[in-house]
């Protein structure tokens, strides 16, 4: 009798611990479950767009409520730039019994370079992950919502915010553009676009990992090393009589898009705008020779003269010039 009881208990433990795991993606998900989550998600999006924390906080789990002040700050930062109708769901996942040591993973696939995985804390037997972004923006903001089912109710367990795309291109798109520039010998453009790519690698912060993330980071190291081997900054533009000194080139965002921004020191009085403008014209006439491809590959280039290389503490006069190439 005692032996039968032990065997029955052991069988019960085995059956409980071996509950089949389940992961469904997008159209594979039960429509009823999807409908429940979409109702909650729309309320949360409304809360962010309207900057009404109570709409979001009432749907949060007890654990997430411990970060209520962080949520309020995030809402204040982004609410003025969001429109509810611009939110698009990229992917969504339903999981059941899918965690190992309270960690679960969702993956978009293993074939496309754009594929990614998200590794997150799974607090409930049933979990649901929604990844979406706001399309009408130069910097397309991404939100990742992780819901858990407690009893009969779904609650928001985690919320991550980041940037998915810049100018409708994600990290992989910018990486491909950077590789194309690199193959043409356009090192400055390659390093600028690689910089944008690496900025976009973590739309859900450290939870998100693109399938080819390591490849992108290795390329970044490669192109950075080659760029600084070829170009020894600071660079004096000796063909311009005032001898301006270029000390930094990076990609800058303006309403028209992202373009190379060239920072340089000048010997000209910073109050003499006409002379500064003429000097900039002369720099621009030589910049294509100095940096291969920069004038043929970009619609415009941004220039910022300074009296000295900034140390980070002083406040100096700064002017900017935009020179169009085509």
Question: Each predicted region: which residue ranges?
Answer:
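Bacterial Sec-dependent N-terminal signal peptides
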Residues: 1-28
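Short, low-complexity N-terminal intrinsically disordered segments enriched in polar/charged residues
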Residues: 18-50, 160-172
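Short helix-adjacent coil turns
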Residues: 44-56, 178, 182-188
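Short, well-ordered alpha-helical segments enriched in acidic and aromatic residues
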Residues: 50-63, 191-195
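Short solvent-exposed beta->alpha transition segments
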Residues: 57-114, 198-227, 280
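Surface-exposed, charged secondary-structure patches
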Residues: 76-140, 168, 225-268
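Short beta-strand edge/turn micro-motifs at domain boundaries
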Residues: 131-168, 252-261, 285-325
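Alpha-helical protein-protein interaction scaffolds
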Residues: 167-223
């Amino acid at each position: 009798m005692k032996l039968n009881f032990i065997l029955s208990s052991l069988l019960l433990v085995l059956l409980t611990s071996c509950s089949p795991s389940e992961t469904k993606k997008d159209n594979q998900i039960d429509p009823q479950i999807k409908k429940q989550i979409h109702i909650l998600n729309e309320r949360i999006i409304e809360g962010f767009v309207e900057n009404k924390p109570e709409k979001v906080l009432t749907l949060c789990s007890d654990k997430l409520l411990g970060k209520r002040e962080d949520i309020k700050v995030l809402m204040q930062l982004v609410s003025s730039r969001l429109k509810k109708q611009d939110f698009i769901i990229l992917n969504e996942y339903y999981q059941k019994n899918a965690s190992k040591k309270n960690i679960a993973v969702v993956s978009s696939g293993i074939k496309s370079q754009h594929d990614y995985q998200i590794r997150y804390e799974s607090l409930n037997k049933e979990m649901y992950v929604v990844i979406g972004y706001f399309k009408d923006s130069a910097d397309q903001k991404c939100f990742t919502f992780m819901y858990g089912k407690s009893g009969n109710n779904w609650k928001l367990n985690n919320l991550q915010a980041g940037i998915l795309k810049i100018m409708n291109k994600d990290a992989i798109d910018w990486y491909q553009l950077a590789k194309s520039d690199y193959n043409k010998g356009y090192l400055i453009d390659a390093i600028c676009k690689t910089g944008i790519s690496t900025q976009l690698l973590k739309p859900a912060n450290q939870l998100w990992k693109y399938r080819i993330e390591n490849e992108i980071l290795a390329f970044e190291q490669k192109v950075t090393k080659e760029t600084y081997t070829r170009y020894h900054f600071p660079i004096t533009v000796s063909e311009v009589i005032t001898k301006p000194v270029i000390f930094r080139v990076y990609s800058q965002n303006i309403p028209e898009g992202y373009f190379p921004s060239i920072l340089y020191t000048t010997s000209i009085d910073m109050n003499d705008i006409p002379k500064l403008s003429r000097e900039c014209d002369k720099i621009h006439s030589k910049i294509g020779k100095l940096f291969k491809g920069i004038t043929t590959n970009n619609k415009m280039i941004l220039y910022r003269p300074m009296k000295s290389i900034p140390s980070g503490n002083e406040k100096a006069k700064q002017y900017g010039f935009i020179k169009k190439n085509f």
